[in-house]
Regions:
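Sec-type signal peptide cleavage vicinity
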Residues: 1-327
Length: 327
């Protein structure tokens, strides 16, 4: 009996993970990496409501290990564009590479929406190399939405993993995302009660930047080449039922909440409105500016002679660099 117990004890002592640096849960499982999140925003994502993700939304994460964050060689992440899915207030993955390593500092770079090496809905991921950081490229699509999904970015550096999983749980590892693109919105109003009854049917304009690239390590967005007049991207929305234009106040005409996402630094041109079946052009748009994380709302006032405009800029995000927090 004693020899059998001794043998059982020997077996139990060898039932461990081969890599002694990998942390353990219940002595035989690695500790998975999970994240909490928030979005620095008044309005957020393509849906333009809320400051949190919805269940089943997916982000991409690149992860490196080392005392210092990567700044030259980006070719060997331990997590290479791993998809994390949001559910029950946290992001998690089943990918086997997403586990903590004992006594290592981990550096994470996250973005939304998840992209692959094949362009989909205007997004494309390019892995890092020995000298170039990983990137996500974004392309404005012709039509109503511009960029189809809001581009968000965050980074986070952990302290060295000690093996105490409660210190590194999702509610402690929070990714705070920041918006990397810009938005334009429209509000059409009558100057006063003397303007005849009017209805808004459509809004159309063109943009001079089609694409941009986000450095996933630094969070810096770089615009592509400026487009010539002949090749500018047209964005527009036409309503099935025209909206009644009222004096400024509640219930303003917005062309069905037409608010496309565009590249920061874009200049718009050829802004036209269809009002009472007439096409009206808004001129002198050079004063409009579009910055990362901002909504520029263009108020177009209909008067007895035509239209005039003004603009106001509001934060799409709170001020912030999109960095993560470890609590």
């Amino acid at each position: 009996m004693i020899s059998m117990l001794a043998m059982a004890a020997m077996v139990s002592c060898t039932n461990e993970i081969e890599n002694p640096d990998q942390p353990q849960v219940n002595q035989n499982e690695p500790t998975p990496i999970e994240f909490g999140s928030s979005i620095l925003a008044v309005q957020t994502k393509a849906a333009k409501t809320g400051t949190a993700f919805s269940d089943n939304e997916i982000i991409g994460i690149i992860g490196f290990k080392g005392d210092a964050a990567p700044n030259a060689d980006y070719s060997s992440p331990f997590m290479d564009n791993i998809s994390f899915t949001y559910a029950t207030n946290k992001f998690a993955t089943t990918n086997a590479s997403a586990v903590w390593e004992r006594n290592a500092t981990h550096h994470f770079y996250a973005y939304y929406p998840l992209a692959t090496t094949t362009e989909t809905n205007g997004y494309k991921y390019t892995a890092g190399t020995a000298s170039v950081a990983p990137t996500v490229s974004v392309t404005v699509q012709t039509g109503e939405e511009g960029v189809k999904q809001d581009l968000l970015w965050s980074n986070l550096t952990s302290k060295k993993f000690t093996g105490a999983s409660t210190e590194f749980s999702a509610d402690k590892m929070k990714l705070q995302f920041a918006h990397k693109l810009a938005r334009i919105a429209f509000k059409v109003v009558k100057k006063d009660e003397n303007v005849p009854e009017s209805a808004l049917k459509a809004v159309s304009f063109k943009v001079d930047y089609k694409d941009a690239s986000l450095n996933l390590i630094t969070g810096e967005l770089t615009k592509g080449s400026q487009i010539t007049d002949a090749n500018k991207i047209s964005l527009s929305k036409t309503l099935t039922t025209a909206e009644t234009i009222t004096e400024d106040g509640s219930g303003n005409a917005t062309c069905g909440d037409f608010s496309p996402i565009i590249i920061p630094g874009t200049a718009i041109s050829d802004l036209t409105l269809t009002i009472n079946e007439q096409t009206l052009t808004v001129s002198d748009l050079s004063t409009l500016t579009f910055k990362e994380g901002d909504i520029t709302t263009v108020t177009i006032t209909v008067n007895s002679k035509g239209v005039e405009f003004s603009a106001a800029i509001t934060d799409w995000t709170s001020t912030g660099a999109g960095t993560g927090t470890v609590e």
